[in-house]
Amino acid sequence: MCPSSFRLILSVILIAFLFVGLCEAHRHINVDIINDIGPNVQLGLHCKSKGKDLGPQSLAPHQHWGFTASLNVWETTLFFCHFVWENQSRWFDILKEKRDTIVCKYHPCVWSIRPSGPCRLTDHEKCYPCNADI
């Protein structure tokens, strides 16, 4: 392979990586979680992804807490949260990129955590069951 062809191929690959990196830098979703378990009930939660632990949080009734998640190029970004209150313990995939991107692309993904399960309030209310215990 001649040196000029090698430089051209290398330049195209470098530009492609830079372009993907710049596009990825602007892809994110904001998640907002609301404690709607009930009056006088504190909600404990701990959210994580494969590579990021957001730490334990505690929310008073109707209090909000949120985070911003960067989305990956494979559309597989996943954050899950463990919720505890009184004698209950549940977990849920609070951010699944393929499920939430269209609805939460321009507005925060707002989740109301209720005894019956989490409900996404963004766009129109949609409730989901919690994940099964393992």
From Swiss-Prot:
It is found in: Secreted. Residues 1-25 form the signal peptide. One of its GO terms (cellular component) is extracellular region. Glycans are attached at residue 87. The keyword Manganese does not apply. GO terms for biological process: rejection of self pollen. InterPro entries: Self-incomp_S1. This is S-protein homolog 18. It comes from Arabidopsis thaliana (Mouse-ear cress).
